Amino acid sequence: MPRAPFSLLALVLGLAFLAWAFSLAGTVGAPSGTVNYTTFLEDLKAGRVKEVVVRAGDTRIQGVLEDGSAFTTYAASPPDNATLEGWMARGVSVRVEPPQGQNALGFLWPLLLVGLLIGALYYFSRNGRAGPSDSAFSFTKSRARVLTEAPKVTFKDVAGAEEAKEELKEIVEFLKNPSRFHEMGARIPKGVLLVGPPGVGKTHLARAVAGEARVPFITASGSDFVEMFVGVGAARVRDLFETAKRHAPCIVFIDEIDAVGRKRGSGVGGGNDEREQTLNQLLVEMDGFEKDTAIVVMAATNRPDILDPALLRPGRFDRQIAIDAPDVKGREQILRIHARGKPLAEDVDLALLAKRTPGFVGADLENLLNEAALLAAREGRRKITMKDLEEAADRVMMGPAKKSLVLSPRDRRITAYHEAGHALAAHFLEHADGVHKVTIVPRGRALGFMMPRREDMLHWSRKRLLDQIAVALAGRAAEEIVFDDVTTGAENDFRQATELARRMITEWGMHPEFGPVAYAVREDTYLGGYDVRQYSEETAKRIDEAVRRLIEEQYQRVKALLLEKREVLERVAETLLERETLTAEEFQRVVEGLPLEAPEEAREEREPPRVVPKVKPGGALGGA
């Protein structure tokens, strides 16, 4: 059956070719002996032409010479009566034939060809609906995936978003028993917009709603609607909602709705581009739901600031549910969910791992456990150990360890003092985070890093931010103190310090010279954000100077601290050169001057030192 459209197309092309061939069948083929018009006139004057045949209105002249040979020539214009009489005066037999009537197929074959093609397209559109790949107009059909069976995911499989689940339980009750709400005259929200940074589980939560309510789940992406063909997006929106009505009660989920729901008038093409037509159709369809239609539209975005206001008004996306990165309790619950089916060793402490992964979202935690499982399988172990999880966390944050990279003794020494500087500043500064781990094992683009012991915190004080800047600058300060020289390793440290200092001045009102004034508006908070400048060039110069002074003050402060703790700095750096990695407990013992236990495993022998391309030292908080 799938080959039928191709057979029909071959038939159409064959008929078109026959029509063209028949159109030429009635015409006289060009005979042999074609001569130019000058030769014909010379033969005419010489009396060698016996007979000519002309057709009225035709420039072609056919004839026979005295020797019996046939010829054909072409004049610039059809011969007139005077010309023909002149030829007859020379004794030439002239026969004039009426204009040749084109056969019907020859005259109508272009129209016939067009008609056949239109008929074929109509056939495709009518009979190819069984499968989108067989239909000539399948690009107007929605690309949504319809899961007629309820997803197996339920609220039990979602963690770290308890408030969002509470908000959505009402939607679940409506989908389970819509008549109860209709009898009370209640109008359930037509649309629910899930807002949050990437990876927090917006799509997972939408599937859980469908699974909890046991209704079909229809999912599409915002980019599925917009195409280069005008009107395709609107047609796909109509088809999507027609599909939803056939499967009601159901959930329609549109992921990354900002691809189609961007504010109108802000893109290329003004009010006439394809994306805006698609958005208009989406608005119309959401308005077109009858009161008793049990269809709930859910959408997800991490850019709510660019959505069209008409999309967010009551009656469309009535509710916006913000889903943020989980706290320590939520992270532990997420880890336990993703740890199902994975053999964990007895030393695994998921609560401790949750404390050590602030800022991780659900996707990060799932990836962490998967990396740990891969590491355990690679090493031939039958269970995942805490060491595997720690290594996986480092891989997720900083990249895989470059065990084959052998540094020169000078580079290792610089890296050790650089990271020791970060660690001592984080340890001794009152409002800093403390040290979770410090290492000089290269990872990603870093030759080493200091991982701070951060906690979930929503409010950052001015003193804490100043200490953060000082910790970021401590690596460069240690280099200057020990080597009386500086390297390029603090590039990323400077970026972090400068960004914090600038935001303290322009956004958070933490500088006495500028006061509680917002000089910049930060947009797009879920994707890292960018600043919209709202001040003059003169103010910009003052801000730049204030940023420089603030950073210089913190640099001198942390440099003085490291000079005071020079002996401890040497001790930590030398221990790093010996052991490469220090945990929080080991670092504390080194700072206090206590001996360390021997490593559990013998260190693998390294290759002889060799010169390698310079890679910038730094850390999770510090260098690049």
Swiss-Prot record:
Cofactors that this protein relies on: Zn(2+)
Binding-site residues for Zn(2+), renumbered to this chain: H418, H422, D493
Activity modulation: The proteolytic activity is dependent on ATP, both the ATPase and protease activities are inhibited by ADP.
Chain positions covered by the region annotation Disordered: 595-624
Binding of ATP, residues: A159, G199, V200, G201, K202, T203, H204
Periplasmic side: 29-103
Chief subcellular location: membrane
Subcellular location as annotated: Cell inner membrane
Membrane topology per record: Multi-pass membrane protein
Biased composition (Basic and acidic residues): 600-609
EC number(s) per entry: 3.4.24.-
Cofactor note: Binds 1 zinc ion per subunit.
UniProt subunit comment: The isolated soluble domain (residues 126-624) forms a stable hexamer in which the AAA+ domains (residues 126-400) are alternatively open or closed.
Homology family: In the central section; belongs to the AAA ATPase family.
Comment field on protein domains: The open AAA+ domain (residues 126-400) probably allows nucleotide exchange and has the protease active site, while the closed domain is the active ATPase domain but the protease is inactive.
Descriptive protein name: ATP-dependent zinc metalloprotease FtsH
Source organism of the structure: Thermus thermophilus (strain ATCC 27634 / DSM 579 / HB8)
Lineage, broadest ranks: Bacteria, Thermotogati, Deinococcota, Deinococci, Thermales
